Structure formats: structure tokens, C-alpha cells
Regions:
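"A position-specific structural signal for the A-helix of alpha-solenoid helical repeats
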Residues: 5, 22-25, 39-42, 73, ...
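Alpha-solenoid helical-repeat scaffolds
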Residues: 363-555, 559-566
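Long, intrinsically disordered low-complexity tandem-repeat segments
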Residues: 609-668
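Generic helix N-cap/helix-start motif at coil->alpha-helix transitions
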Residues: 1-3, 140-148, 177-186, 198-199, ...
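TPR/TPR-like (Sel1-like) alpha-helical repeat modules
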Residues: 210, 223-251, 741-767, 800
Length: 825
């Protein structure tokens, strides 16, 4: 038996009897501590009393309340069982249990020790100078040893009650204890509540967040209660105060803003590997090349200037400096946007013995930390440690790494470098006092320290990792905490809108889907746009259309209108799409994308219904909406089935997805068929040529024109345009597929085969890059499509066009074999 065999009956069906039977079997099978057995006996006796009362025919008006209270007691006992399972399974919890036995973790006992430490430190000012330093170091070392034991004790502490939670909250908010101690204990409770969802520990963190006036303590408590929220809301719902607390906190706009900032920063942390790769590949080589220092076996020395360099090329130094400044600015811009630019470098510096202790990963940086004793001696007379503590731009974890590393190489440094350690220039751009007090900066710094722990701690798999975007294994969490059902409420909808925009910009479609599922019942028109992305990604255009249509007419936003127009185009309701684009153009008469989309819709109107599958040319029926951009008209995927519309979505219902599958406005117009006079189509044609005249170098317009040429049977003209498109650096894989169709339809089969092979190669390259990016972010990626599958899928989507111009199903099958060079019959 296990924790989950007790837990599931409770949260799924509130079945106390089944949970107690499972717990009885667990006690019989495993040697559990006496306090768990005692708790089980108490709950069992309470439940038997209820049963006995019912057997005697007694009626209790509060029977439901009593049953719920017993349910909560069983839940608490099940959490204690979970702690014991972790102690047996994971070394970190086993060590914590051993260490905890030496420490009394009752709030009153803890308060006595922490307040005594503050008083003793104050009394050090009256000690003689010749003994003060030694006594302070001993006092600090003893206190650190106590805090280490207390941290471990809290990690494996049994489930609290409301009284203990309130006492600890009062203690951590008390001005009579050291702030660093309060910060460390907040982290200890957070780590405990993350791995064993004790609602009372969670409530203590929330209470500290609400009442704290110290910004650093407040933000650490924010991170604590957010990360210890469970993804499954059923457990916490047994405790009404959890929902009440969440509702009260979310009523505060400042809290909402801080949560949104925290969510975005967590996603930046998850992208640390990709950011590090960008820095190592495109920035660091330039910075290293232009440095005048080199490492030798004797230490760091300055390189001699090359006297021939200025003679051969007198402008080299200036160019090198400009290039170095440009790369450096790029790195600083990445940092300002939220990127964790220091992770790559400092991740190699977490092997010091300092990081063997669990609590040190969460310790605020303090130059007086006992583990920095050797560093203080080697840096005696230097202000380096104080500068690092006050102005260093790194998170606390990296500050410790930096201090320990500098101390190791201090003896091998040139004198001028040692002198530089006394200045702020050592750290590059320092952090101003105002920035250090900014809640967003405080939160970012703490999250970066946490990210390093969950990525680099030697026993990291002992703990749930909140920086994972997919639940890949049992000990992984979900970094997208704003998709938790416990937080889904009207107050959070504006945050959800802002976050979805952030995710969309980064093409994080899986995360948008998670948000959409969480807020599927919302009627917020700005949020509906993102909710519709889920069915749009699956090609469920009617479902997406219904979502947009559910928005009252007078509440439509520009974004929801764009999404609705896109659905209309995909559903071939071109008349309705025309009306919506005219409405959008009334808002923005000069909008290029709206004009281009209107032109395609006009050319695809009902007046050309005789064309068969008339111009689904903007049919993004395969749209995965992955890069839906409110203002984009990315016709890069114009054409062919290729239009998997990775470039279109709810907001960019654009001509970008003009595809072959959708034979377009004149799809039935073969080489010898003349278009019938039609004012609507004529308007579309004029508008298209107008856009081409005004934007002669716009690839999107050229793609639409090329597509129209092919649809009308003017294959030579289409080939000419596609040839020019393919010669441009911004050519996309879809251009090759469309060009292949044009050559195939003109019976230049050899060239078509070559282009189709190039198309397959590019698609495989794009899939490999997407898979690598997903791997770095810890996310799952879609299965790779085989060439056979891809071509069959494309040809099937584009069957109407190919059939109209005489390419039969048999020819399509043979073409697939030719492209694949299949010879095994």
C-alpha cells in the first residue's frame, strides 16, 4: 500500500472508510512512526463513534460537518505517510529526518533561539577587539549549524494545524529575529509544502506574504505560496480556508501584477539553456577574442599587444571595440528582458563543498557566512565581498559561487586585477539601490537561485521540480502555474490575456492550450481569442467560430474580429469574411494585412462558386496557429498544403496561408478558361495589383500573385515569381512546394522532383530545430513526420488543384515514390 491508495479515495469520492482501510494495510505492511499510528487510531475511533451513533438511531444535524472534519484528519495522516515514503526513498529526506531529531521545531523553541542570536550578536559590540572576531565567527558558525538542522526539521515536519501555522507566521514576521533567518525558513517551508501539500504550511506562506512589509521577505513568501500550490485542486478543496485565502489575495491588483511578473520570469528561467547557447555561440567568442588577458600555468597575465596589427590594419582596434560593445549591449538587453544570462557560466561553479548542504542553496548572500571564512582571509583588506553583497547583479546562489571561485584564484591574479576587485567594475553593470528594491527584481533573483537548485543540486531528483513545462516524470511539476484550476477566476482573466500574448509571441502553443483549457468558460472577448486557438490548431474551425460568435456584437475587439474572419475563410464563408475585413479596414484604412486578406476573400467570393473548391486559398485548415500575430500578414506559407499555417492564427487570418489545397479564387480557370466578368473579383484583382505596386518587394504579395497565376493556368509566370522568391534569403519551405507544383503542372517533372526533395529536407531541418528547442525547455515535441507521410498529406490536401490540371491519384502515388527514390518493390 502507498500514500496514493489512501489519498485517492479521499479526494475523488470523500470515502473515509476506504481510506482508513488502506491506511490500516499500510501500517500493517510498513513500519511507520508511532505518531502516525496514534493519529490513525484517533481518526478510526472518531469514525467508529459516528457509526455507533447511527446504529443507535441518533440523528446529528451536523453529521456532514463532522464527516468533513474526519476526512481532513485522514488527509493529514496520509500526508504523514507520504513523508515517510520520501524518507525511505530519497537520501535528502532521510538525512533531513536524522538531522531533525536533534532539533526542537516548535515555534516557541525556535523563537527563543533566533531572538537569542540577535541579542548575542548585538552584545558583540561590547567585546574587546582582540577577541571579538573569533567570538563572532563561532557564534555565527553555531547559529548556521542550528539553522541547517531547523531547515531539515521543517522539511520533514508532520502536517501542521492552524495554531502552529499562525505561530510560525508571527515568528517570521517578528522584527526581533534576523531577516536572513526568516528568509531561509520561508524557503524551508516552501520546499516542504511543494513536496507534501500541507495546506497549513501553504497558508502560513500566504499569511507572511499578505502581512510582510519587508519587500524581500514578501516576494520570497509570494514565490513560496505560488510554487506550493498543487496542480490538482481536489486536496486543497477539503480545506475551505485555502480557497478563501486565494480569493482574498487575487482581489488585490498588486498581487495580480506580481504573479504575472513571476510567471513570465519562470518561463524565462525555463529558457536558460537556449539563452546560454545564444550567448556562447554568438556573443562570448567576440568578447573573449578582444580581451587582453590570458590564463597560463602561473596564473592570469596580460597579453602583449601585437605591434604589427596597427601597421597592417590601423582600424582593427576600433572595429573590434565596436563589435565587442555591440555584442555586450545585446547580452545586457537579453538580461533586461528577463533572460538568465549568468546561468551558463555559474552552472559550472556549483561543485564547491558549500553546495553539498541543502540549506545553502536557499541562503541569502551574507559575507559573514561560515563557509566563506577562507574567502574572507584571502580577500582580507578587499571590499570585494561587501561590494558583491550590496551591488552584485547576480542571484544569491551565484554570488556565493563567485566569492568562492575568486578566493581560489586570488593568489594567481595580477596586481591590477586585485585592485579592480575593490571597485564595482568587477561585476560589470551593477544594480542600483532602487532596482534592488523593485519587487520584480527581487522575485527574479530568487527564482534564479531556485532554478539553479532544481537543476544542479546533486540530489535534485529527490524534489519536485517546478521549472518543468511538461509533467514528464513523477517528480516534475508544471512551470505554468497560472493554468492551475485553483487560480482560475474572473480576477485572473486579464492576467491570462497578458500571459497568452506573452506565450504567443514565443510560439508556446502547448502552454496556450493549457491556459485555454483552464479558462474555457470565459466570456472575456480578449481571452476568447486565445481560447479559440485550441480548436483552430486542431482544424476545428466551426468550434472556434462559435467561440468568437459567443461574444456580444458590441463587445468585439479587433483581435476577436480578426480571429472570426480567419475562421470564416477556413469555413469558406468568404462573404462573411469580406464583411469583417471591411469592418477592420474601417478601423485601420491603411492596414496592409487587412487589404491583402480582403483581396483574397473577394477573389474567393460566392460569385466564383462554380470554381469548385473556390479559393480556400486562405484556408488555413491545417493551421496550428503557432505564430499567430495580431498584425502579421505572413504569406510565407502561401501555398500548398504546406500552409500548415504555422504562420497564421486567430489574429492573423491572412493571405499567408494561401494554399494549393485550396484552389483559390480562380481554381477552375485552366489555361484556356477565361474568367467571367465579376465586379467582386475585379475589385479583388485591382486591390491585389495595387498592393503589388505599393509594395513591389513584399514577398507576401508576390506569393499571392504567384499563386493566382498558377490557379489561372499561367504556370510560366508563376514559375518566374517562385524562382525569384527562392533566390531570397527569407524563402520558406512552402515556396519550394508551391514552385514544385507549378513545374509539375507545366510537365517539368524533373525540376518538380528536385524541388520536392529540397522541400522535404527543409521540413526535416525545421522539425529537428523545433525538437531541439523543445528539449532544451524540457517540453515534449510532436513526432517527426516521415517523408512519405508528409508528401501524401500534402498531395491529399491539394488534390483539388492537382486533379483540375490533370494530375491523377496514380500520378501522385508515383511522384511520392520518385521523390523518395523507392526501389524496393
Amino acid at each position: 500500500m502507498s500514500f496514493y491508495e489512501i489519498y485517492i479515495p479521499l479526494i475523488a469520492k470523500h470515502n473515509v472508510g476506504k481510506a482508513l482501510r488502506a491506511m490500516k494495510e499500510t501500517i500493517a505492511e510498513d513500519k511507520l512512526p508511532g505518531y502516525i499510528v496514534a493519529r490513525y487510531e484517533d481518526v478510526k475511533n472518531d469514525y467508529r463513534l459516528m457509526q455507533d451513533a447511527m446504529m443507535r438511531g441518533l440523528r446529528d444535524d451536523k453529521i456532514d460537518e463532522v464527516y468533513d472534519d474526519i476526512t481532513r484528519k485522514v488527509y493529514g495522516a496520509s500526508l504523514d505517510v507520504l513523508i515517510e515514503e520520501k524518507v525511505k526513498k530519497y537520501s535528502s529526506f532521510a538525512y533531513a529526518r536524522t538531522s531533525a531529531q536533534q532539533t526542537e521545531a516548535h515555534p516557541d523553541a525556535v523563537r527563543t533561539v533566533l531572538e537569542a542570536y540577535v541579542q548575542d550578536m548585538a552584545m558583540m559590540a561590547f567585546e574587546p577587539e582582540n577577541t571579538r572576531k573569533a567570538k563572532m565567527e563561532k557564534l555565527t558558525a553555531d547559529h548556521h549549524a542550528y539553522m541547517k538542522q531547523l531547515f531539515n526539521a521543517l522539511l520533514v515536519a508532520p502536517m501542521w494545524n492552524d495554531r502552529r501555522a499562525a505561530d510560525f507566521a508571527d515568528l517570521l514576521l517578528s522584527p526581533t529575529i534576523d531577516r536572513d533567518d526568516a528568509l531561509l525558513l520561508v524557503s524551508a517551508v516552501m520546499l516542504a509544502a511543494m513536496n507534501v501539500n500541507d495546506p497549513y504550511k501553504w497558508d502560513m506562506l500566504a499569511e507572511v506574504y499578505v502581512r510582510a512589509t519587508d519587500k524581500v521577505l514578501k516576494m520570497r513568501a509570494l514565490v513560496g505560496w505560488v510554487l506550493s500550490l498543487p496542480y490538482d485542486p481536489r486536496g486543497p478543496r477539503l480545506f475551505p480556508f485555502v480557497q478563501e485565502r486565494i480569493k482574498a489575495m487575487l482581489a488585490d491588483k498588486t498581487t495580480l501584477k506580481q504573479m504575472l511578473d513571476m510567471q513570465m520570469q519562470m518561463l524565462f528561467c525555463c529558457n536558460a539553456d537556449a539563452d546560454n547557447e545564444e550567448i556562447q555561440r554568438n556573443i562570448m567568442p567576440t568578447l573573449i577574442k578582444n580581451t587582453n588577458l590570458q590564463m597560463t600555468r602561473l596564473g592570469i597575465v596580460e597579453k602583449e599587444d601585437d605591434p604589427m596589427k596597427d601597421i597592417m590594419d590601423p582600424n582593427t582596434a576600433e572595429r573590434d571595440m565596436e563589435e565587442m560593445e555591440r555584442k555586450y549591449r545585446k547580452m545586457m538587453d537579453m538580461q533586461k528582458q528577463g533572460s538568465d544570462i549568468y546561468f551558463g557560466g555559474f552552472s559550472k561553479m556549483k561543485t564547491f563543498p558549500f553546495f553539498y548542504d541543502l540549506c545553502n542553496w536557499f541562503a541569502p548572500f551574507n559575507a559573514a557566512h561560515p563557509a566563506l571564512g577562507a574567502a574572507r582571509e584571502r580577500l582580507a583588506g578587499s571590499t570585494f565581498l561587501n561590494n558583491l553583497m550590496e551591488n552584485g547583479p547576480f542571484c544569491d546562489s551565484d554570488k556565493y559561487s563567485f566569492a568562492l571561485a575568486i578566493a581560489q584564484i586570488m593568489d594567481r591574479m595580477p596586481d591590477n586585477i586585485k585592485e579592480m576587485l575593490n571597485s564595482d567594475a568587477t561585476f560589470g553593470p551593477t544594480v542600483s539601490k532602487d532596482d534592488q528594491e523593485d519587487p520584480a527584481y527581487i522575485c527574479r533573483s530568487y527564482l534564479q537561485s531556485l532554478y539553479r537548485f532544481f537543476r544542479l543540486y546533486r540530489s535534485k531528483r529527490d524534489f519536485l521540480n517546478p521549472f518543468i513545462l511538461d509533467e514528464l516524470e513523477d517528480n516534475d511539476g508544471n512551470a505554468l502555474f497560472m493554468s492551475y484550476k485553483l487560480l482560475a477566476c474572473p480576477e485572473m482573466e486579464e492576467n491570462a490575456v497578458a500571459l497568452c500574448g506573452f506565450l504567443l509571441k514565443r510560439k508556446m502553443m502547448r502552454e496556450i492550450m493549457s491556459m485555454a483549457i483552464c479558462y474555457k468558460s470565459s466570456q472575456n472577448p480578449r481571452l476568447v481569442r486565445f481560447l479559440a486557438l485550441v480548436p483552430m490548431t486542431d482544424g476545428k474551425w466551426q468550434e472556434a467560430y462559435d467561440l468568437f460568435a459567443s461574444v456580444p456584437e458590441d463587445q468585439h475587439t479587433e483581435e476577436s474580429l480578426r480571429g472570426m474572419a480567419h475562421c470564416c475563410m477556413s469555413l469558406k464563408r468568404f462573404g462573411e469574411a469580406v464583411a469583417i475585413y471591411r469592418r477592420l479596414l474601417a478601423m485601420h484604412p491603411d492596414s496592409f494585412s487587412y487589404q491583402l486578406n480582403l483581396a483574397v476573400c473577394l477573389m474567393s467570393s460566392d460569385a466564383f462558386s462554380s470554381c469548385g473548391d473556390a479559393a480556400s486559398s486562405c484556408d488555413a485548415s491545417s493551421c496550428d496557429a503557432s505564430s499567430c500575430d495580431a498584425s502579421s500578414c505572413d504569406a510565407s506559407s502561401c501555398g500548398a498544403s504546406s500552409c500548415d499555417a504555422s504562420s497564421c492564427g486567430a489574429s492573423s487570418c491572412d493571405a499567408s496561408s494561401c494554399g494549393a489545397s485550396s484552389c483559390g479564387a480562380a481554381s477552375s480557370l485552366g489555361g484556356k478558361v477565361e474568367a467571367r466578368p465579376n465586379k467582386v473579383v475585379e475589385e479583388g484583382t485591382k486591390l491585389l495589383y495595387k498592393l503589388d505596386y505599393e509594395h513591389p518587394n513584399n514577398a507576401n504579395v508576390r506569393r499571392v500573385l504567384a499563386w493566382c497565376m498558377m490557379l489561372q493556368g499561367h504556370f510560366d509566370k508563376a514559375i518566374d515569381i517562385y524562382t525569384r522568391l527562392l533566390s531570397q534569403p527569407d524563402a520558406v519551405s512552402a515556396d519550394r512546394l508551391n514552385a514544385a507544383y507549378a513545374h509539375w503542372l507545366s510537365r517539368d517533372v524533373a525540376r518538380a522532383v528536385a524541388l520536392l526533395r529540397e522541400y522535404c529536407n527543409l521540413c526535416e531541418q525545421e522539425e529537428a530545430e523545433a525538437k531541439e528547442a523543445a528539449k532544451k525547455q524540457g517540453r515534449r515535441c510532436e513526432p517527426t513526420k516521415s517523408r512519405n507521410y508528409r508528401l501524401v498529406e500534402d498531395f491529399t490536401k491539394d488534390a483539388d488543384l492537382l486533379s483540375k490540371y490533370g494530375i491523377s491519384l496514380t500520378e501522385r502515388k508515383i511522384m511520392v515514390d520518385i521523390v523518395l527514390n523507392e526501389e524496393e518493390f
